[in-house]
A protein has these predicted regions:
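Acidic/histidine-rich, metal-coordinating catalytic segments
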Residues: 152-167
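Short, low-complexity, polybasic intrinsically disordered segments
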Residues: 165-185
Length: 185
């Protein structure tokens, strides 16, 4: 996976997973993979993930794959709820949905995103703008998903928005990266 994995400890996560049999993909909406990983390991934060993948392909593992992470929230998919118990959560360092204002693409955190890093989704009645995922992220994501599928009985790879209707991540900019996994299932 290029460069190895940085292991951080999310001591708040101790319950064993039942499975896992699905992978849930998220974006961080944070300013860097490292800052997002450190945030998610804080004991006062009621969220966590198994892995954070940075824009250069760097990987931070926060929770072992056989331990429950808190990434799915109130969730439901294929007739089953409480998906933290059955799923592996992968966060990708990405600013998510952008707004266009004054000729600039601006993330929710206030960061300006260069036009070459913007994905335009024209599937609705007006264009929506999203931060692009990098080729390295997509490659590492595919490698991790493949390894997980070889190790666990993974049936589904879905976006957070597919299991929690109030969420929009990982957004349409990532659809191409995990559609091949969905097509196999």
């Amino acid at each position: 996976m290029g460069g190895g994995v940085v292991h951080l400890v999310s001591a708040k996560n101790t319950r064993r997973l039942e499975g896992p049999d699905m992978i849930v993909l998220h974006y961080t909406a944070g300013t860097s993979a490292e800052s997002s990983a450190l945030f998610l390991t804080r004991p006062d934060v009621s969220a966590s993930a198994h892995v954070v993948i940075g824009r250069e392909g760097e990987v931070f593992q926060l929770v072992p794959f056989n331990i429950e992470a808190w990434h799915a929230g109130k969730s439901w998919y294929a007739g089953r709820g409480g998906l933290n118990r059955y799923s592996i959560g992968i966060e990708l360092d990405n600013l998510g949905k952008l707004r266009f204002s004054g000729g600039l693409f601006i993330a929710e955190c206030g960061r300006v995103v260069p036009p070459e890093e913007v994905y335009t989704d024209c599937s609705g009645d007006r264009p929506m703008y999203w931060h692009r995922y990098t080729a390295r992220q997509v490659r590492v994501l595919r490698e991790i998903c493949t390894l997980l599928e070889e190790t666990y009985p993974i049936r589904d790879v879905v976006g957070h928005s597919a299991i929690t209707p109030r969420k929009i991540d990982p957004g349409p900019a990532l659809e191409f990266a995990f559609s091949e996994f969905q097509d196999r299932n």
